[in-house]
Curated annotation (Swiss-Prot):
Name of protein: Probable acetolactate synthase small subunit
InterPro entries cross-referenced by the UniProt entry: Acetalactate_synth_ssu, Acetolactate_synth/TF_NikR_C, Acetolactate_synth_ssu_C, ACT-like_dom_sf, ACT_dom, AHAS_ACT, AHAS_small-like_ACT
Transmembrane regions listed in the UniProt entry: none
Lineage of the organism: Archaea, Methanobacteriati, Methanobacteriota, Methanomada group, Methanococci
Keyword Amino-acid biosynthesis: yes
Name of the gene encoding the protein in the UniProt record: ilvH
Family (UniProt): Belongs to the acetolactate synthase small subunit family.
Metabolic or biological pathway: Amino-acid biosynthesis; L-isoleucine biosynthesis; L-isoleucine from 2-oxobutanoate: step 1/4; Amino-acid biosynthesis; L-valine biosynthesis; L-valine from pyruvate: step 1/4
Domain of life, source organism: Archaea
Record-level Gene Ontology MF annotations: acetolactate synthase activity; acetolactate synthase regulator activity
Pfam families assigned: ACT_AHAS_ss, ALS_ss_C
Keywords per UniProt: Amino-acid biosynthesis, Branched-chain amino acid biosynthesis, Transferase
Cellular component terms per the entry's GO annotation: cytosol
Length: 172
């Protein structure tokens, strides 16, 4: 039996900033049976173009297939894989943590400071903390505060850019 190694792949795509593009991209993944781990979309320095960052798990054949299929979509301008060591990848996470006592609040604030996060909301029974960083950093913070009681959590998914002078740009 052959053991095919699955890896996390981060794909960056420049697309036309118009209605229906994201639906066509997600439809492609659905039709092909590919699962999207996370997807983020945002406008670029050019208001007519958006950057879509997609995280998928799979072997290299799946990655190759995904990139080929994305390149066939009419509103997709350019697609590239962003390798972990050759890119900056970040995620934002908001976590509402149960902290009914001053001692619990103090503990959450201390953990947040160690992880260079921010307390963005404070109520009598909870705090909302903002943590930004790598997926591993966010997961480590979640594991640390889990025993205190996570009431609610929202993660943005990964967004990324290539390191150094390399840029993903439309063909001229």
């Amino acid at each position: 039996m052959v053991n095919i190694m699955e890896h996390r792949h981060v794909i960056s795509a420049l697309v036309l900033n118009k209605p229906g593009v994201l639906q066509r991209i997600s439809g492609l993944f659905t039709r092909r049976g590919f699962n999207i781990s996370s997807i983020t979309v945002g406008i670029t320095e050019n208001p007519q173009i958006s950057r879509v960052t997609i995280v998928v798990n799979g072997d290299d054949k799946i990655l190759e297939q995904v990139i080929k299929q994305l390149n066939k979509l009419i509103d997709v301008i350019k697609v590239s894989e962003l390798e972990e060591k050759k890119s900056v990848q970040r995620e934002l996470c908001l976590i509402k943590i149960y902290a009914p006592t001053e001692s619990a609040k103090s503990q959450v604030i201390q953990y947040t400071s160690i992880f260079r996060g921010n307390v963005v909301d404070l109520s009598p029974e909870s705090l909302i903390v903002e943590i930004t960083g790598s997926e591993d950093k966010i997961n480590a913070f979640i594991d640390l505060v889990k025993p205190l009681g996570i009431k609610e959590m929202a993660r943005t998914g990964i967004t990324a850019l290539a390191r150094g002078p390399k840029i993903l740009k439309p063909k001229s």
